[in-house]
Amino acid sequence: MSIVINWKPDLIAIEDIQLQEFREGKKVDSDNIKGILIFKTLARLQGVIIECCIEQGIDYTVCSTNTWRAHCKVKGSTRSDKKRSMQLLVKEWHDVTVTEDEADAIGIGYYASEIYGKQNTIVNWEE
């Protein structure tokens, strides 16, 4: 919360959560239960973040993973391919090497700033 108060962002972008579906023919096991518990924890965290945004008067958006990845032109068919693609895009854009999570955060921010960010115009007062 202190980072929000100190930085006073115009917008906070949150990646949407998704419940991994059970595979057909697979019985419910500890992996499925773990996935459900993770989903519930992320849903609660998302709610807390949204409530903080509302309390502080900060705009927020919840971004679908597929939507921000498509906007950033992420390539790949598997999860790991898409993660690596986003890392390479960040390297291309900013010439920095980042982790998968950092690359995803940059991609979400890139998407949100272009789609929802305030459009600032420069006024030439000398004219």
Language model features with spans:
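Phosphate- and other anionic-substrate recognition elements at nucleic-acid/protein interfaces
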Residues: 1-127
